[in-house]
Each structure stands twice: as C-alpha cells, then as structure tokens.
Amino acid sequence: SCMKAAPMKEVSLRGQGNLAYPGLRTQANLENLGGPNDATRGLTSLADTFEQVIEELLDEQQAIQPSKENKDADLYSSRVMLSSQVPLEPPLLFLLEEYKNYLDAANMSMRVRRHSDPARRGELSVCESTSEWVTAAEKKTAVDMSGATVTVLEKVPVPKGQLKQYFYETKCSSKGYTKEGCRGIDKRYWNSQCRTTQSYVRALTMDNKKRVGWRFIRIDTSC
C-alpha cells in the first residue's frame, strides 16, 4: 500500500542531482521525508521536487536557445532527431515544451495547476490529434522560410557513417472532429473546423540548385 511505501529515509538524491541534471537542485525538500507519519507531507514534497526539476530544465533550455532578439528564435522546435532507427518515444524537449505551454495557458500556481490537470477532470480536447515520427523518405519535400520548396534529405553524414532524419509531427486525427466541427462548439450558432497548423524546424535539405544545407522547414506540429 502507499502507507507501507511512504517511508523514504533511504531515498536520497544528494550528490546525484548534478550528475543527472547539471545545475539542478533535485534534493530540495527531501529532508522532510521522515517516516510513516510524514507520508502525505513526504509525497507532496517529492511531487514539488519533480515540478521544480521540470521548471529548471525549461530554464536551462531557454538559456541555450538563440537570443529572443532573433525574430526566428521562437520558430525553432525540438521535433527533429537524427537516429539509425525509429525513435521509440517523443523527444524530451518536446514533452517539456508541451508541459510549459500547458502551464503558460493556466494563470495559476503550480500546485493548483497540478490538481486542475484536465486528465484528472475527465476533460476532452476540442480537436483530436495524433503524433508520430516520420522519415524524410515519407516527407520528400517541404517549404522553407523563404517560401521555396526544398528536398528533405533522408540521411545525414556523420563521422562513422550516416543517420536518418526523423520528424515528430502532430496533425488533426482523421477520427476526430475535423469535418463535423470542433468538440463543444454549438453548431446552431457557430461554424468551426479543426485544422492542422505548422511550425518551423531545422533540417538538412537541398534546394532546386542542388545546394545542400541546414534550413528551417515547415512541418505539422499541432491541431
């Protein structure tokens, strides 16, 4: 049971925080995990610690991204991966961005946001979407930031061979409310439609003059 698993004196993240997450204070609040009588307080502190780790990871990511003075900086996405095989999970930075977007959309404290998670309240999305990894062989071409159509190269040369380019795309689900309108919108008074929207990611491409280079291209990223 939870009460039996609650004592966490043996669980110590001291000395491990900098190894797993450089610069993060993962040991914060773990001193309060005292024993069975402190089970509720201990688990709450642990949850707060995980939230703190996520927030600090986001801060670290923002620190290494281009300056916000660059108008294209906010168009960059972490949905591209170079790999020898199909990735099994969504990219970590993508998950962090999704979490950050959810936090930004809710103007409330983190603890209130956690307890108001839509998944806990049984809420449904206005538009259904699906996400999956696709290869350059499936994309073939894309539109770059200048509006030109470029060829997306399937493989990227590396010192020990070649790696494939994978793109994590999100689009409206064919089983969703794309044609019938958005969920929750009164059709008697409003017309609505779910549409797939795009963002820019950086990929290795070739233009119509056979010039190969890294360019920002548009891929499906939301519904």
Curated annotation (Swiss-Prot):
<dbReference type="InterPro" id="IPR020430">
    <property type="entry name" value="Brain-der_neurotrophic_factor"/>
</dbReference>
<keyword id="KW-0732">Signal</keyword>
<dbReference type="InterPro" id="IPR020408">
    <property type="entry name" value="Nerve_growth_factor-like"/>
</dbReference>
<dbReference type="GO" id="GO:0030424">
    <property type="term" value="C:axon"/>
</dbReference>
<feature type="glycosylation site" description="N-linked (GlcNAc...) asparagine">
    <location>
        <position position="107"/>
    </location>
</feature>
<keyword id="KW-0339">Growth factor</keyword>
<dbReference type="GO" id="GO:0007169">
    <property type="term" value="P:cell surface receptor protein tyrosine kinase signaling pathway"/>
</dbReference>
<dbReference type="GO" id="GO:0043524">
    <property type="term" value="P:negative regulation of neuron apoptotic process"/>
</dbReference>
<dbReference type="GO" id="GO:0005615">
    <property type="term" value="C:extracellular space"/>
</dbReference>
<keyword id="KW-1015">Disulfide bond</keyword>
<comment type="function">
    <text>Promotes the survival of neuronal populations that are all located either in the central nervous system or directly connected to it.</text>
</comment>
<dbReference type="InterPro" id="IPR029034">
    <property type="entry name" value="Cystine-knot_cytokine"/>
</dbReference>
<dbReference type="InterPro" id="IPR002072">
    <property type="entry name" value="Nerve_growth_factor-rel"/>
</dbReference>
<keyword id="KW-0964">Secreted</keyword>
<dbReference type="GO" id="GO:0038180">
    <property type="term" value="P:nerve growth factor signaling pathway"/>
</dbReference>
<feature type="propeptide">
    <location>
        <begin position="6"/>
        <end position="114"/>
    </location>
</feature>
<dbReference type="GO" id="GO:0008021">
    <property type="term" value="C:synaptic vesicle"/>
</dbReference>
<dbReference type="InterPro" id="IPR019846">
    <property type="entry name" value="Nerve_growth_factor_CS"/>
</dbReference>
<feature type="signal peptide">
    <location>
        <begin position="1"/>
        <end position="5"/>
    </location>
</feature>
<dbReference type="GO" id="GO:0030425">
    <property type="term" value="C:dendrite"/>
</dbReference>
<feature type="disulfide bond">
    <location>
        <begin position="127"/>
        <end position="194"/>
    </location>
</feature>
<dbReference type="Pfam" id="PF00243">
    <property type="entry name" value="NGF"/>
</dbReference>
<dbReference type="GO" id="GO:0021675">
    <property type="term" value="P:nerve development"/>
</dbReference>
<keyword id="KW-0165">Cleavage on pair of basic residues</keyword>
<feature type="disulfide bond">
    <location>
        <begin position="172"/>
        <end position="223"/>
    </location>
</feature>
<keyword id="KW-0325">Glycoprotein</keyword>
<dbReference type="GO" id="GO:0050804">
    <property type="term" value="P:modulation of chemical synaptic transmission"/>
</dbReference>
<dbReference type="GO" id="GO:0005163">
    <property type="term" value="F:nerve growth factor receptor binding"/>
</dbReference>
<dbReference type="GO" id="GO:0048812">
    <property type="term" value="P:neuron projection morphogenesis"/>
</dbReference>
<protein>
    <recommendedName>
        <fullName>Neurotrophic factor BDNF precursor form</fullName>
    </recommendedName>
</protein>
<dbReference type="GO" id="GO:0008083">
    <property type="term" value="F:growth factor activity"/>
</dbReference>
<comment type="similarity">
    <text>Belongs to the NGF-beta family.</text>
</comment>
